Amino acid sequence: MNKIIYINKKINNFKKKIFVPEDKSLSIRCALLASQALGKSRLKLLDSEDIRSTLNCLRRLGVRIIKQNDYYHIEGRGINGFNFKKNLVLDCGNSGTLLRLLPSLLVRSPYKIKLIGDKSLSKRNFRVAEPLKHFGAQFSNNKTPPVYMKGTYFVRPITWREDIASAQIKTCCLIAGALHAPGITKVIARPSRRTTENLFKHVLKIPMKILKRKNYDQIEVRGINQFKSFNYNVPGDMSSAAYPLVLTLLSKKSELIIKNVNVCPTRIGIITILRKMGVTQKYIKFRNLRVVKGERIANIFVKSMNNLKAINLPKSFNNSSAIDEFVLIFICAAFSKGISTFRYLEELNKKESKRLDWGYKILKMIGIKTKKIGNHGIKIWGNPNLELKKNYVIKNYLKDHRIAMSTAVLGLARGGSWKIYEPDSIKTSFPSFIKMIKELGGKIN
């Protein structure tokens, strides 16, 4: 039987301090890299389905992992130190990040490995086969899972040009180059999240250069023989913080402090967009801003605001900095004054579900005038005075966690009676989401 969450009442005004779960992208990268280090790494990671999939894959590759209290102890045997048998199958669950980064550790695998995922992941593009082929790896059925991969003993460094701003493809190339290829690997790509670069530079001490050009970055990494184990407390995820942030912003007479969040410039695109929509420091502000191991960490203060302005998002905006938050941004635009336009977002339809289409569908459902722009954009006629009073049903059968949480925020902030299917999908990134909503005073069943 499909599970459903019910929301029948707006959230009351609140004034709270909360924490959000650890950064999912950073948690997966830390776990994967710890498996290649020499010695035992001690990591405080996100506890979610995607991280469990990551750790289960590493265990099947022969990595010893123990959890003690809130910390994972991952015992690496060095680069290419995996120990596994032939005909191995690795289940990536729902994690596109894991699917695309794990193969970078397997470039020298002597055996064929099969990578699979759940129903949603099996429809998503694999993407990293082409750069890994240049390193020397072999693939069959390399478009969507299941993917079959075999490594090579003769890995060569590459120069890879990437037209889209994809932190995952960039990371896959950087890890494969640093850990397996002698010489210098270069990645030339549009700017994207620098999570991996910060780990290399500030935590693992892997030599690299970042050359910033007008429209792209050129990143160079030199192949290494080994690196030491490390300790890391992963900070809060901006993508998770976005939900209570928007809930507070769109609710009435509420204030919230979200503590210990990763606010690296390439992660805070939603705040950059909200600034352009008139959200000043009075309504969203960073407090206790500091830099820890290359990442900017802050407590985010947010309070309710009822006069958002429409936005025409420029082509120059780095969409990758808000790629997981655009459905929330569309919801904010729906309650702003004026006509908002968002373009060049075709990447949204390559996520767990077609999120650009979902954004259009949700806004039409609640009575917002909305128009599609080709296959890449959306135009939204905002209505600040709209009150939601009808019954709404979200049949989230592809189990997209961000659709479930975005529509929950919409119902809690602006009313209506909501039935949202497949709430278990939330466990992918934010297992404590419903608990957090209840702590803020929301009625969600």
Give residue spans per PLM region.
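Structural preference for solvent-exposed beta-strand-turn elements
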Residues: 1-445
